[in-house]
């Protein structure tokens, strides 16, 4: 099956600290690559706990610049080593006080391709996301990766008709053998 794409999706339990979460995901990526995965996507805010059940400014410490932060750089090297496309949902700081729930997309050669910022930010009891994140401002990009066109959603955006329509409208229309994958 020449057109078969093997994808890995990872959702893990919180280990208690950022570094051990990153190591856990590095190990999982290596394991997925050994099993033939060509692309891997981690869970929302992958290196931290899902902290949005409370409103506490201490969690701003989990923010990183994308693409210039240490986690993006670290996984660029890993993507290149494993020859694997990676989707890394992280807590992004654009500037002090401006934060996003963002997924960085890294190609199989380690190239940073861009990012998707979560568009739909819930704000109900137990999901105080607007305390932490601004709505994304970069649209619904499609990334041309080594495995094909990839669109990225984070959490509630997958239920948005507008997001799906925008991703579909930018997808290739030819009978090309290139694949298109939307990761939610």
Predicted regions, residues:
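Short polar catalytic/cofactor-binding loops
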Residues: 11-16
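Extreme N-terminal starter segment of soluble prokaryotic enzymes
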Residues: 2-7
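Structural motif
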Residues: 9, 41, 87, 152, ...
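Short, acidic/polar
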Residues: 20-29, 158-166
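Residue-level detector of alpha-helical recognition elements and their boundaries
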Residues: 22, 36, 40, 124-125, ...
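Cys-nucleophile CN-hydrolase/nitrilase-fold catalytic domain and related Cys-dependent amidase chemistry
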Residues: 18, 27-109, 115, 181-184
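Single-residue recognition of alpha-helix boundary sites
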Residues: 22, 54-55, 118, 168
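Active-site catalytic loop in hydrolytic enzyme cores
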Residues: 64-67, 77, 94-184
């Amino acid at each position: 099956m020449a057109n078969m794409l093997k994808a890995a999706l990872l959702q893990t339990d919180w280990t208690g600290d950022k570094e051990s979460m990153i190591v856990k995901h590095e190990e999982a990526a290596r394991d997925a690559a050994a099993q033939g995965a060509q692309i891997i996507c981690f869970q929302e805010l992958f290196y931290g706990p899902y902290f949005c059940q409370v409103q506490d400014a201490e969690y701003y410490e989990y923010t990183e610049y994308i693409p210039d932060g240490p986690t993006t750089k670290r996984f660029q090297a890993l993507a290149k080593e494993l020859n694997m496309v990676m989707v890394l949902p992280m807590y992004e700081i654009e500037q002090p006080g401006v934060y996003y729930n963002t997924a960085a997309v890294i190609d199989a050669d380690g190239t940073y391709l861009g990012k998707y910022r979560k568009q739909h930010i819930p704000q109900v009891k137990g999901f105080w996301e607007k305390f932490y994140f601004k709505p994304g401002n970069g649209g619904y990009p499609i990334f041309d990766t080594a495995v094909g066109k990839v669109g990225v959603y984070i959490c509630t955006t997958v239920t948005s008709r507008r997001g799906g329509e925008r991703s579909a409208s930018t997808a290739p229309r030819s009978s090309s053998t290139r694949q298109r994958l939307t990761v939610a």
